[in-house]
Every structure is written in C-alpha cells, then in structure tokens.
Swiss-Prot record:
Binds 1 Ca(2+) cation per trimer. Ca(2+) plays an important role in interaction with the host cell membrane. One of its GO terms (cellular component) is host cell cytoplasm. Residues 179-188 have a biased composition (Basic and acidic residues). This is Baseplate puncturing device gp45. Fe cation binds at residues 183, 185. GO terms for biological process: symbiont genome ejection through host cell envelope, contractile tail mechanism; viral tail assembly. Homotrimer. Part of a complex composed of three DNA circularization protein N, three baseplate hub protein gp44 and three sub-complex wedge (made of two copies of each baseplate protein gp46, gp47 and gp48) that forms the baseplate.
Length: 197
C-alpha cells in the first residue's frame, strides 16, 4: 500500500475542513423582520461578514422578537453562508441569573417574567397582568388572597358565606328583597319608622 504524504493529505482535507468550519457560525443580530411567516434576521458574522435573510425557526407555540445586539448561532445548510438558519438566539444582557437547578421560565428585557420553580410554584413578576377571555375564566383553588384593593366593574355573585372584618359602604343594600335605605316598618308606639339614617 502506497503511503500518502502529509502535504498531499492536507491538500485533500483542507477544502473539507473549510466547509465543516463554515457550517456553524456565531453571530450578532443587527435587524429583525417579524412581518413574515418566518422571522428573518440580518446578522453580523465573524470578520465583518454580514448575512441578510437569515431565517429564524422557533418552536411551535412559542414566539419572541430578539433585540438588536442579541447573539445567535447560525447553521449554514450545505456550508453555504447564504443558506443560514438561526437555530438559537440568546441575549446575555437580560437573561435572569442565579436560578435554581430545574427552574424554567420566560423573561423580557424590561424585567418582567414568568418563573416555574420547585414545589409547583409559578411566579409571575410584572407591572400589569391583563386577561382577555371571550367566554369565561375559572380560578379553581381552595383559597385566593388579594393583598391590595379589588375593583369589580359589573355584578358580583357570591354563593358561599361572606365575612367582613370592616365596614361596608354602599348606597343601598337589598336583603331578602328589602331595601335597607328605603325600608320602613311599624314603630313600637304606632305609626311607621322612617328610612335608615
């Protein structure tokens, strides 16, 4: 068997190694186009190389729009730099740190987040929570605590007992079909009582 010298082997392997090196690249996100069916990125690669129309594939049911300056891992199909796909986009500037093993969640660069932790806890941290439901909403829990004021803008139906440890303020209360504001009854010395004062 004839021995291949090192320089001949290097000449054979160099083009192959170059293509392997071109298959994956680190990149910095410059521009995001979220108006298409598949999100497109313009990214800066190594050595001042820019790549437009890089498709960013996201898991079904999940979405995000990265900020300029986020980092990406680009896979180039067939080692062709014009066939890039962003397989991972991360932003170390805003990623929550010092989490516990097993924690998972969603975060936003402004600081609000949903965090799933051990012992079945879901912690939502934000300024405002808005829930829009076309039909109904059910909260099924043995106990609910509100630590601030609660405002109900429409009717309230209570099927269980109610306990109040402070005053109730209302223009009128209807109890057993009778108005506490306009209710009168016979007085103990004849006549009728006036409305409640």
């Amino acid at each position: 068997m004839e021995r291949v010298n090192d320089s001949a082997l290097n000449r054979l392997l160099t083009p192959l190694m170059r293509r392997v090196r071109l298959m994956l690249a680190r990149a910095v996100v410059n521009v995001i186009n979220d108006g298409r069916k598949v999100q497109n990125l313009q990214v800066g690669l190594l050595d001042d190389e820019e790549s437009d129309e890089v498709e960013r594939l996201q898991n079904y049911g999940h979405f995000s729009v990265p900020l300029p300056g986020a980092e990406a891992l680009i896979a180039c199909v067939g080692a062709q730099r014009d066939q890039g796909i962003a397989v991972v986009v991360e932003d170390r500037r805003y990623r929550p740190t010092n989490l516990e093993p097993g924690d998972a969640g969603i975060y936003h660069h402004e600081g609000h987040r949903i965090r799933l932790t051990k012992d079945g806890r879901c912690i939502i941290t934000c300024k405002t929570v808005e829930v829009y439901a076309d039909e109904s909403m059910t909260v099924d829990t043995p106990r609910t605590t509100f630590t601030g004021d609660v405002e109900i803008q429409k009717g309230l139906g209570v099927k269980g007992k109610s306990q109040f440890d402070s005053n109730i303020t209302a223009p009128d209360a209807i109890i057993n079909g009778k108005s506490t504001d306009k209710h009168i009854h016979r007085g103990d010395s004849g006549g009728t009582t006036g409305p409640m004062q």
